C-alpha cells in the first residue's frame, strides 16, 4: 500500500495520507504519552500482531463489548497511529448472496501495510525491520507543519495543533 486511510486527523476524522507523511505523523504521535494504547488497545494490538489484521466483529468478541465500544477502541488506535484500514470487503447476505451496499473493514498495523520486509504479517513479523522515520519526533512535527503551511498558508498554530495532535 502507498496510501494510509483511517481516523487519524482532526481528533479522529477519516483521512488519507501518503506513506511519507503518515510515517512522520506516526513518528511524532507515538513519541507522546497521550498516544499510547490503553489496556483494551494493547489486547487489540496483540491480536493484530498474531493474526495480521482484525475486524470490528473480532474486536467485539475479544473485548466482550458492543459495536459502539469496539468502534471507539479502533478509532483510538487509528488516532494513535497504531492501526490503519488494511482492506474493505463487500458483505453478501441472504440465500442469493445479495449485496446491499454494506462493507466491512479489516484493520492492520501501518508497519504491515508499508514495510518493505518480505515477511508476512504474523508473529514472526516482530523479527523484521519496523517502519522507521528518518527524523526525530520534533523534526517530524516541523516537517508536517511546514507541509501543511505550504498547502494552507493561513493556518494558525492552533489549527496545526488540532490537525496534527
What are these regions (language model features)?
Residues 1-165:
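Long, low-complexity intrinsically disordered regions
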